[in-house]
Amino acid sequence: MTSSADLTNLKELLSLYKSLRFSDSVAIEKYNSLVEWGTSTYWKIGVQKVTNVETSISDYYDEVKNKPFNIDPGYYIFLPVYFGSVFIYSKGKNMVELGSGNSFQIPDEIRSACNKVLDSDNGIDFLRFVLLNNRWIMEDAISKYQSPVNIFKLASEYGLNIPNYLEIEIEEDTLFDDELYSIMERSFDDTFPKISISYIKLGELKRQVVDFFKFSFMYIESIKVDRIGDNIFIPSVITKSGKKILVKDVDHLIRSKVREHTFVKVKKKNTFSILYDYDGNGTETRGEVIKRIIDTIGRDYYVNGKYFSKVGIAGLKQLTNKLDINECATVDELVDEINKSGTVKRKIKNQSVFDLSRECLGYPEADFITLVNNMRFKIENCKVVNFNIENTNCLNNPSIETIYGNFNQFVSIFNTVTDVKKRLFE
């Protein structure tokens, strides 16, 4: 007889199986462990282990329409498709980036709200979110049983950002052209850039997507950063005429291989242009592009997830957290705080600056040493004043790439610890 615990496991296995395409590595590992359990318990359960699943929602969206077409009579819901990084939240209870399959940490209140929405309707396959300028918007909800409008209303009650949408009855064959597209785009009446419009006909599950645009080339004058939150900065690409080209995040900047004082390909919409990442933008390797972008942005910033952050105060916070002492705003405060604890002072004295700085940032030791062995440093008064990576091939390792993107932060902490150690023991 099947036990209550077995039923719980089987239900979880079925739920994970249905959402495999939207799963991250953690969810896949859980799924595989349940498959192994099910096979050993029941011999045959009808599903198999998986090694890698590409996150995809293509079954729910038809081919994108790039040219004018006739739309049939009927009742429709029109939704904006926003510019930004697309994520899927599904029964696996993880926010997973479309395409890469990488999971993304979200605030507890957003996770709780998403779970409440999913639990309200067991026919929901997934919630679609977009992340732009560190702001989450739920832009679609796929359910077998109800319209996304109903789910939007519930999501809004739970505190999630939802899109403006249009409910329209079309009474006769209508040409959907640039003019109608522009009217609808304006009717959504919000400030977020929209890359396309999707629509659903009443009674149908599959979305249609309309994306009218033109390709163009623009001359890049500079690459800068814009502040979008508390020590969060997004890349900004400026043309010779002073216009901004929209960039999703740091990875988008890298993939496009954009370089100052060159032309780049863009998708031109009605009111803005989007940086287009394609192979024609150059022959540089990803590692070479990362090095150049970081050199361009400057030593005051480091890669922090999808965005940039400024070195300095964040480094002091990580150092005080590692030492388990009160937060300090300056090096003077840090020295005073360390002097209050003999244990902390001995730790500073006995551990190398190199190791303590690395541990503060949680870098894997082997990957960190591999990176350092491919770099050259300029040292003055025991502090790093400059560094250069001599072989970018090591950046093919994603972990090493992440460490290098964050290396300005390491240098800041290293120099701070060096300064603190001198004041304490010399």
UniProtKB/Swiss-Prot annotation:
InterPro entries listed in its UniProt record: Chordopox_A20R
Pfam families: Chordopox_A20R (PF05941)
Superkingdom of the source species: Viruses
Any one GO BP annotation for this protein: DNA replication
Cell membrane keyword on record: no
Protein keywords: DNA replication, Phosphoprotein
UniProt-listed Gene3D superfamilies: 6.10.140.1880
Subunit structure: Interacts with the DNA polymerase catalytic subunit OPG071. Interacts with UDG/OPG116. Component of the uracil-DNA glycosylase(UDG)-OPG148-polymerase complex; OPG148 and UDG form a heterodimeric processivity factor that associates with OPG071 to form the processive polymerase holoenzyme. Interacts with OPG117.
Function: Plays an essential role in viral DNA replication by acting as the polymerase processivity factor together with protein OPG116. Serves as a bridge which links the DNA polymerase OPG071 and the uracil DNA glycosylase.
Family: Belongs to the orthopoxvirus OPG148 family.
Name of the protein in its database record: DNA polymerase processivity factor component OPG148
Organism: Monkeypox virus
Organism ancestry: Viruses, Varidnaviria, Bamfordvirae, Nucleocytoviricota, Pokkesviricetes
